[in-house]
């Protein structure tokens, strides 16, 4: 943030971390409703906060700082050879933008969770769960549809902000897993940011020790929020 802002926040009770099972998780939750708008949220993103449903939070764990906010500059990003291949592979995909949450989205989400994440905390899927973390009353998310021959095979949910995008969640038809639609969704959001003159795509938190969260480091160069400062990372760790 470019100016000092005093935030009213709450602190959640400690509980086992869903990313690192040996750690205790605790979150700061924003209580100041004056910042619940697109520009306010964008400022909070630069300070390491994140949206889930209507709530904005940031990790505040007692003995761990593994979560690092990560963002990619839309003009500086250089796709790797494999990312170029994935983009080429999906040239036959039609991308459609929508602010309407269509019934077919949840049907696809439910199938995705049941087949891809049946061993995780999001199983079993439900409409309440789906709406609880994707929907937002004060800022409707943008849905990036991926269609093959007019059939919905993937959806990336993202927040469209004044100067950036914030990727929320991507789900897809497990029958098309060989297309690497998760990677394609991020590449498509980067292209959307670039075409609309938005500088950044925020990807949420990177957790190096967690396989489900460390895939984000493959998008280079990127920036990570480390000890309150955004640091440029232009190479993969050894």
From Swiss-Prot:
Keywords: Acyltransferase, Cytoplasm, Transferase. This is Aspartate/glutamate leucyltransferase. One of its GO terms (cellular component) is cytoplasm. One of its GO terms (molecular function) is leucyl-tRNA--protein transferase activity. Belongs to the R-transferase family. Bpt subfamily. It catalyses: N-terminal L-glutamyl-[protein] + L-leucyl-tRNA(Leu) = N-terminal L-leucyl-L-glutamyl-[protein] + tRNA(Leu) + H(+); N-terminal L-aspartyl-[protein] + L-leucyl-tRNA(Leu) = N-terminal L-leucyl-L-aspartyl-[protein] + tRNA(Leu) + H(+). Its EC number is 2.3.2.29. Functions in the N-end rule pathway of protein degradation where it conjugates Leu from its aminoacyl-tRNA to the N-termini of proteins containing an N-terminal aspartate or glutamate. Pfam families: ATE_C, ATE_N. One of its GO terms (biological process) is ubiquitin-dependent protein catabolic process via the N-end rule pathway. It is found in: Cytoplasm. PANTHER family: ARGININE-TRNA-PROTEIN TRANSFERASE 1 (PTHR21367), ARGINYL-TRNA--PROTEIN TRANSFERASE 1 (PTHR21367:SF1).
